[in-house]
Amino acid sequence: MTPPRKLHIKSYGCQMNVYDAQRMVDTLAAEGFVETASAEEADLVILNTCHIREKASEKVYSELGRLRAAKDQAARDGREMSVVVAGCVAQAEGDEIIRRAPVVDVVVGPQSYHHLPQLLARAKADGRALETEFPVEDKFGFLPQPSRQAIRARGISAFVTVQEGCDKFCTFCVVPYTRGAEVSRPVAKIVEDVQRLADNGVREITLIGQNVNAYHGDGPDGRPWPFGKLLHRLADIPGIVRLRYSTSHPRDVEDSLIEAHRDLGALMPFVHLPVQSGSDRILEAMNRRHTADDYRRVVDRFRHVRQDIAFSSDFIVGFPGETEQDFTATLALVTQIGYAGAYSFKYSPRPGTPAAEMKETVSTADMDERLVRLQNLIDSQQSAFNRAAVGTTVDVLFERAARNPGQIVGRTAYLQPAHVVASADIIGQILPVTVASLERYSLLGSLASAPASRASADDAPPVGASSPAIMGV
């Protein structure tokens, strides 16, 4: 019997890339590949790249330098290692990667990874392969379903892509150029995916897309369904006890989504709603096509139907032309909304975007200082949000054994890690936890129906940090 070939995937960036990596694993499993944690031992290494962060390309080339040494060592050991660059950097800079990095065998954009087996065969025959065009066919129709064993191994929470691409064209963002126009999957296909996950032990589904609440996929009645109607349908699937989604655009919050938050107990009261700035002048320069007050009104609509709802967001400081007055408006918005957590970044130009051509730049010193001030405010809000849980009883969906022996860790409705001392048979259940204290960003407590037994958290990320949001909206 031929031994399985080893596959190593390193993903950068958002939840969509995590999902894409899983689907690449599923696609290549049929070709005899199994995952390995070691790039050095792999027969195939895939860098699944993100183009949002600063110096994204440089990080890819740095990693490719390390892989060149690993590939050379594999050749000396009599093994053949193939290297693939996938994702949004591949889409944006495919020709440049081929030119600069001879170690790379295949470059493939995020809309074409269902072609990986053919591209690997082409590279073996011709030396290298590049595919960064947007294919006419829907890739989801060509992707194999994950095996039952793969689903169970990935745990009780899963991502499902319902929408890809973005039509908003914010001036700072590369997503419309790397992921293409907005495309929504049919309702029936999404239901089929979620049903298969539920049948194999998944209890929590996070619906993902670059602009997920712009979803308008074809329903079984032949009409486009809004996102809220899709959520209602998925909430009816037996076994699914929690629904989440990311990432949302304020302009696409339709009444059906608000109604879903009002009506569905399975829909978690935690919304990632990026705003980027609190200054109307900067929002206009970003082509956000909403004002700060528009954003406040959207938040109010959510809160009107679900008083326990909480929000996270994204912010950019130092966008071209941002003044101290503009930045003060951002601080005012953060203060007024009150976030459970947020991501904040210094502006960095993305080649090919309109903002990259703007001349009125902000100094690095000013950006650094503003980022510290903003993050301090966000951190104080997150700390207050977490402290408010102490002394209360919260529902926790338990996910896995913690690193500390005897502990089980799960997450609250707000993605806060919660640790208790308990047996592993609670994994997959939602149980009440009495919160006794905090350790770093984690809640420590005991099962409400069991004798109190203080847990000690292993290192856990802040709210939202373990599952980075889909960037670009």
From Swiss-Prot:
Biased composition (Low complexity): 453-462
UniProt keyword annotation of tRNA processing present: yes
Entry keywords, A to Z: 4Fe-4S, Cytoplasm, Iron, Iron-sulfur, Metal-binding, S-adenosyl-L-methionine, Transferase, tRNA processing
Residues where [4Fe-4S] cluster 1 binds: 14, 50, 88
Entry annotated with the keyword Isomerase: no
E.C. numbers: 2.8.4.3
Example of a GO cellular component annotation carried by this entry: cytosol
Family annotation (PROSITE patterns): MTTASE_N, MTTASE_RADICAL, RADICAL_SAM, TRAM
Cofactor: [4Fe-4S] cluster
Domain Radical SAM core: from-to ranges: 152-384
Domain MTTase N-terminal as annotated: residue spans: 5-125
Residues involved in [4Fe-4S] cluster 2 binding: 166, 170, 173
HAMAP family reported in the protein's UniProt record: tRNA_metthiotr_MiaB (MF_01864)
SUBUNIT field: Monomer.
Name used for this protein in its record: tRNA-2-methylthio-N(6)-dimethylallyladenosine synthase
Organism encoding this protein: Nitrobacter hamburgensis (strain DSM 10229 / NCIMB 13809 / X14)
Chain's gene name: miaB
